[in-house]
Amino acid sequence: MKNVIAAAALSLVLSDFTYAHEQRDEAMMKITPSTLADADIQAVSPALARFGREAISNDLWQRDALSARDRSIVTVAMLIARNQPGELKHYIAVALDSGVTPAEVSEIITHLAFYAGWPNAMSAVSVAKAIFEARGVTAEALPAASPTLLPLNEQVEKQRADTVEKNVGPISPGLVKFTADPLFLDLWQRPALKIG
């Protein structure tokens, strides 16, 4: 899961395209932008509307390499990182309809706060709150603020800590502490986004 989010962060340029089709059960669910209808796009840029249908809806979102669930996670992560609340509202709903849990949406927002910026995460919180309320998602469906963390791989953590200390410790001891305490010893050990 975290690898998917990391891949999303590296693929931000792809998030400009916001059309999609996705197979859900037996029926095809049409995914369209939350803020613009195809007719509105065509009124300004017929070519952009065509590229959206042909390259994005009929190709990218139809590929088997990612499930609807994983593709939705990547899209939500990119929209959070780029602070695109208009499209985020639509794609959080798509993610929930594609099997992403409210707990996972919550953890994606939390995780990206550290990498995409706190203001972007706060914007995402505002969007997700409205969607959660509309869908009846309660606090019980969300991860605890301080859950039991996943087991720490001590050997890998020591190697990571030693590398960070060697490379940045002499010039930025605060970065060494900050990457260890809230990130690798807490955030990355939270169970709601575990791989698998």
Q: Language model features by range: what are they?
A:
Residues 19-69, 82, 93, 97, ...:
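Acidic, glycine/proline-rich low-complexity segments that act as flexible tails and inter-domain linkers
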Residues 7-15:
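Bacterial N-terminal signal peptides
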Residues 78-84, 116-117:
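Short alpha-helix boundary/capping elements
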Residues 1-4:
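Positively charged n-region of N-terminal signal peptides that target proteins for export
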